[in-house]
Regions:
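A structural signal for the main folded, soluble domain(s) of proteins
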Residues: 18-24, 31, 47, 71, ...
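Short coil/turn segments at beta-strand junctions that form active-site/ligand-binding loops
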Residues: 28-29, 55-56, 103-105
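Short beta-strand element of the alpha/beta-hydrolase
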Residues: 28-36
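Conserved alpha/beta-hydrolase
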Residues: 43, 48-73
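Alpha/beta-hydrolase active-site loop
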Residues: 79-98
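Primarily recognizes the serine-hydrolase "nucleophile elbow" in alpha/beta-hydrolase
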Residues: 98, 102-130
Length: 130
């Protein structure tokens, strides 16, 4: 298993800190971790490493206002457009992974606030992301 750090630029120019855990062999599936309020993607390292050992490529990112995306904000999300921005960010990342791993099953693992962001994304998607 190898792990790497990266950044993902959103449509409005925000840079999101992200991590990926890749299996040593070709992956059989992909998992996107969408963390909860006050968390960050690094909290899922042990779980992601375990999944990578099961031949699953795992990606996680730090939401706006969280983790290494915004280390000084401690979970603050903009009141006017924050939740919509989180949903747009998930859409961009999910679609990017679908293109990159075309044909592989892609699962979203969402916790707490991340589950609300994920549900909203699934409800508002123009096409079926599932």
């Amino acid at each position: 298993m190898t792990s790497e750090q990266l950044t993902i630029q959103t449509d409005d120019g925000k840079e999101l800190f992200a991590r990926k855990w890749l299996p040593d062999q070709a992956p059989s599936a992909v998992m996107l971790i969408v963390h909860g309020m006050g968390e960050h993607s690094g909290r899922y390292h042990d779980f992601a490493a375990f999944m990578a050992d099961q031949k699953v490529a795992v990606y996680g990112y730090d939401h706006r206002g969280h983790g290494l995306t915004d280390p000084d904000q401690k979970g603050h999300i903009d009141h006017d457009d924050g939740f919509k921005a989180l949903t747009r960010d998930l859409k961009k990342i999910h679609r990017r992974l679908n293109r990159e791993y075309n044909g592989l099953p892609l699962f979203i693992f969402a916790h707490s606030m991340g589950s609300f962001v994920t549900m909203r994304y699934l409800q508002t998607a123009e096409d079926s992301p599932a």
